[in-house]
């Protein structure tokens, strides 16, 4: 009985072992059939391909760029507003009825162009009266001078007294004074008549008219007839931090005009290029900034008064600078660093000293050299000494994207 009992247990154990072996055989066959051909081939080519769990994982894909040596312009940037070089409110200098306007709203005018006319009738009358009085007094003077000549002859023979001669001399002098006053009155009346024709005091663009024809206007009107803004040239007033003052002053001492660029509100389109005109004479204590004025020819009317723009002033150009994409520059506990690729596509961390930069590129003053390859994308997957796969970045495919890329390359860097 005891031998048969043991035999039954042996049979049970053998059956269990056979079942387990059959299960593992079936499971391994399914894994083999479901494996991708590429993965199978990679496993066969791998030195450890015959051992489960020892196959190497795929390399981390990254994008890279080469550090280049180039001249990098240094810009100071600020926000500003376009202002007219001159703004003039055209007012009448005499009182009267507005008879005519000789401009179109928004028109460009030259200094001296006729803008408006006031009824000249009263001024013509006043001029005629002054001229008449002058003629009358000139006749009186001529008569007084003739009498004086006679008195002088009679005085020689004592036919007139010395007192009478002096009185006649005084009359002549008085009449001469009257003549000068009359001449001034004529000039004043002529000036009043001239002022009835209102002309442009400066070159510029006229705005909207402030008064209609037929209205009575006076020299005391505050609104005036029209406002002229001088836009050729035109100015840009922007602010810089007080820390930039020394840089601007040093650049001015070089003797060359400092170029100032005006960019649109989104800082994506260059509107015009001018030169630095002046610095303000004091710092705004509230904001810690100083006002700067630049002047633009604006012959294409790209700039308009009160327009908001981004200002960029070129103060220096750094020659032979090592430049990399800004995306490659990282910040860690030890400071700024970049991941550098060697010839085997293995990465290593290099501490660097950055210089001037913008959103596209950064100058590296120390830590790498021109020709070094740095990782620009896929940085979060990197570890020291890891081998990576370098893939190409997706390039600009449309003309607009290419143009934008070229424009960023021209814009340079800022401090």
UniProtKB/Swiss-Prot annotation:
SUPFAM superfamilies according to UniProt? HlyD-like secretion proteins
Region Disordered: list its residue ranges: 31-56, 392-415
Q: A GO CC term?
A: efflux pump complex
Looking up InterPro entries in the UniProt record yields:
CusB_D23, Multidrug-R_MdtA, RND_pump_MFP
Position of the signal peptide:
1-21
UniProt-listed Gene3D superfamilies: 2.40.30.170, 2.40.420.20, 2.40.50.100, Helix hairpin bin
Concerning its family, UniProt says: Belongs to the membrane fusion protein (MFP) (TC 8.A.1) family.
What does the protein in this record do? Answer: The MdtABC tripartite complex confers resistance against novobiocin and deoxycholate.
Name by which UniProt lists this protein: Multidrug resistance protein MdtA
Q: What's the source species for this entry?
A: Escherichia coli O6:K15:H31 (strain 536 / UPEC)
Q: Which gene encodes it?
A: mdtA
